[in-house]
Amino acid sequence: MAIERTLSIIKPDAVAKNVIGQIYSRFEKAGLKIIAAKMCHLSKPQAEKFYAVHKDRPFYPDLVKFMTQGPVMIQVLEGENAIVKNREIMGATNPKEALPGTIRADFADSIDANAVHGSDGPETAKEEIAFFFKPDESFNSIGV
């Protein structure tokens, strides 16, 4: 099994509900280590650039607006198969389809306000981590 890193964002809706600690607890119970974290309020240009892959999709303007409406908590998670593990913990994009006990089933309100973002693959994870964190802003937990 491979030790991987993935980017996770706790979105404005979940930050506003004050459930950051509960979400972090789920990461840790699943064996994921939080090796970098920061809270920030994304600017419109940041959100547009980060979600540029969706630029031609009809939901893009609403996504950018949503992601800039309040602070987000951004973290790098590390662990065995971190990408898949995080996506399992998050649950389906649509909270109505998410399994009970997943973050989205428990904390999300809608497909738009769905509490969390997670990288969908190794290359995306590298790009997304580099978007928010400089190399010296995360810590290698291997061997600790």
Curated annotation (Swiss-Prot):
GO terms for molecular function: ATP binding; metal ion binding; nucleoside diphosphate kinase activity. Its main location: cytoplasm. It is an enzyme of class 2 (transferase). The keyword rRNA processing does not apply. Its cofactor is Mg(2+). The active site is at 117 (pros-phosphohistidine intermediate). InterPro entries: NDK-like_dom (IPR034907), NDK-like_dom_sf (IPR036850), Nucleoside_diP_kinase (IPR001564), Nucleoside_diP_kinase_AS (IPR023005). CDD domains: NDPk_I. GO terms for cellular component: cytoplasm. Disulfide bonds: none annotated. It catalyses: a 2'-deoxyribonucleoside 5'-diphosphate + ATP = a 2'-deoxyribonucleoside 5'-triphosphate + ADP; a ribonucleoside 5'-diphosphate + ATP = a ribonucleoside 5'-triphosphate + ADP. It comes from the Bacteria. Its EC number is 2.7.4.6. Gene3D superfamilies: Nucleoside diphosphate kinase-like domain. Keywords: ATP-binding, Cytoplasm, Kinase, Magnesium, Metal-binding, Nucleotide metabolism, Nucleotide-binding, Phosphoprotein, Transferase. ATP binds at residues 11, 59, 87, 93, 104, 114. It is found in: Cytoplasm. Belongs to the NDK family. Homotetramer. Major role in the synthesis of nucleoside triphosphates other than ATP. The ATP gamma phosphate is transferred to the NDP beta phosphate via a ping-pong mechanism, using a phosphorylated active-site intermediate. This is Nucleoside diphosphate kinase. It comes from Coxiella burnetii (strain RSA 493 / Nine Mile phase I). The gene is ndk.
